[in-house]
Amino acid sequence: TGFKFEPVNLLGSWVFFLLVALFEEILMRGYILGRLLHTRMNKFLSLFISSALFALLHIFNPEIDFLPMLNLLLAGMLLGASYLYTKNLCFPISLHLFWNWIQGPVLGYEVSGNNFISSMLTLHLPEDNVLNGGAFGFEGSLICTVLMIVFTILIVWWGEKREAISLAVPRSY
């Protein structure tokens, strides 16, 4: 494991991942999930459909396989739930940006199967396996699967609790 700090590369990669997050979140959460919710479709079905489409956006990524596709679906659920309950794209955009940026340019993992030339840390994994995600990167790992499920459940729990409280509190006019 090595360390190198290259501010220009870090800033450039941050801008790149910001553009990726903006594009994907505006399209998948802002437009597609927003339109599905506007049809009065069940919010969880809308969330699942938009998440499946998000995963399909990545179908041609290098090293794609079943577990990375599952994790991309779960990532879509996490990002979608954060939009669903905050009603604001800033949270999923920020989450998406920092998720990708920290994985690749900071920690040195592949991001959705894509390798980046420069990272702060250089990881030398003993072998590619389902625990470290192999050639797809951390998003291809079982650890990622567990994290996505846990954090999605937490966001849904928080959001449902928040909605229940807001419905129970009478508004004064």
Descriptions of predicted regions:
Residues 1-26, 33-39, 168, 173:
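Juxtamembrane helix-loop-helix connectors linking adjacent transmembrane helices
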Residues 17, 43-59, 72-73:
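Small-polar-interrupted transmembrane alpha-helices in polytopic inner-membrane proteins
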Residues 68-129:
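Functionally important transmembrane alpha-helices
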